[in-house]
Amino acid sequence: MNATVKCTLLIILGVEIIIGCLGNGFIAVVNIMDWAKRRKISLVDQIFTALAISRLAFVWSLLTVLFTSELYSALMTTRKVLIIFNNSWTVINHFNIWLATCLSIFYFLMIANFSNSIFLSLRWRVKTVVSVTLLMSLLLLFVNVLVINTFIVISVDVYKVNTSYSSHSDNNIHISRIFLFTNTIFTFIPFSVTLTIFLLLIFSLWTHLKNMQHNAKDSRDPSTTAHIKALQMMVTFLLLYTIFFLALVMQSSKMKFLSSTVFNYFFEVISLAFPSGHSCVLILGNSKLRQTFISTVWWLKSSFNAAELPGP
């Protein structure tokens, strides 16, 4: 039974890796080619490109850790390897999460309708707001890495004192839980920001529709359409984000059955669903990416049909 479940999870994992690489690679290539052609790039395209690159790195880092832990499990007990892997994953995951949060902030400032002077000031300085948010997040990244490295050093030193097999296994589980628990705490901050933005967008849409009804105007104006489109993307993003966050919470818990190999693969599948699935949402939600994707599909279809035609 476990072998069947494990095989199924590996197939799903493989599909997610392919989707993640193709989807995020597509976003990065399209925006970089457009940048090279126009000699300029908009703020939202900058965020899209950086997010796509960070998610490509996330997919490959997760794949590297998975293969290393399966094939060279002894390496995962050394301090140097643990620090390299954990720090790499922490940094990549940090930018993956915070760039997505910055994208939410950008959409909120550009779409929401509030007459508050502070909000209007932030809207006019949206590029500065995004830049400052990323810079401030680096402080959290520094603290996150510092805490994780401290726990790794302490845990490895304890393991060296007691080198029995059971202590080796327990120590690996302990390090993993500390690592995941720490990342869960630091992931909760951008998650809270994104959730707040989502609620504010709903409130903005509600007040906008209320004003439209009061003025007896058509509710299907450009602002309403933009609100609904942004909320649709945010709902999907929040759903994937919530699943990813809950997976971190469960992995960092002390329930022993969650330490089994099958559950480890299950959590890997959940972790990859966020960067892989959200890339598809971004492509479908962005007009330039969507049109380029459709054109690419039609070109590939035409090329395939032409190749199948028999020669004279």
Swiss-Prot record:
Q: Which residues lie on this side of the membrane: Extracellular?
A: 1-9, 68-90, 155-184, 251-264
The residue ranges crossing the membrane are: 10-30, 47-67, 91-111, 134-154, 185-205, 230-250, 265-285
UniProt GO molecular function: bitter taste receptor activity; G protein-coupled receptor activity; taste receptor activity
Give residue ranges on the Cytoplasmic side: 31-46, 112-133, 206-229, 286-312
Q: Which GO terms describe its biological process?
A: detection of chemical stimulus involved in sensory perception of bitter taste
Q: Which UniProt keywords apply?
A: G-protein coupled receptor, Glycoprotein, Membrane, Receptor, Sensory transduction, Taste, Transducer, Transmembrane, Transmembrane helix
- What is this protein's tissue specificity according to the annotation? Expressed in subsets of taste receptor cells of the tongue and palate epithelium and exclusively in gustducin-positive cells. Expressed in 15% taste bud cells in circumvallate and foliate papillae but only in 2% in fungiform papillae.
Q: Which GO terms describe its cellular component?
A: membrane
Supply the CDD domains for this chain: 7tm_TAS2R14-like (cd15019)
Q: Which residues are glycosylated?
A: 2, 86, 162
Which Pfam families does the entry link to?
A: TAS2R
What Gene3D superfamilies has UniProt attached to this entry?
A: Rhodopsin 7-helix transmembrane proteins
What sections of the sequence does the record tag as coiled-coil?
none
Q: Where located?
A: Membrane
Q: How does it sit in the membrane?
A: Multi-pass membrane protein
Q: What does this protein do?
A: Receptor that may play a role in the perception of bitterness and is gustducin-linked. May play a role in sensing the chemical composition of the gastrointestinal content. The activity of this receptor may stimulate alpha gustducin, mediate PLC-beta-2 activation and lead to the gating of TRPM5.
Miscellaneous comment as given in the Swiss-Prot or TrEMBL entry: Most taste cells may be activated by a limited number of bitter compounds; individual taste cells can discriminate among bitter stimuli.
What family does the database annotate?
Belongs to the G-protein coupled receptor T2R family.
Q: What is this protein called?
A: Taste receptor type 2 member 140
Q: Gene name on record? A: Tas2r140
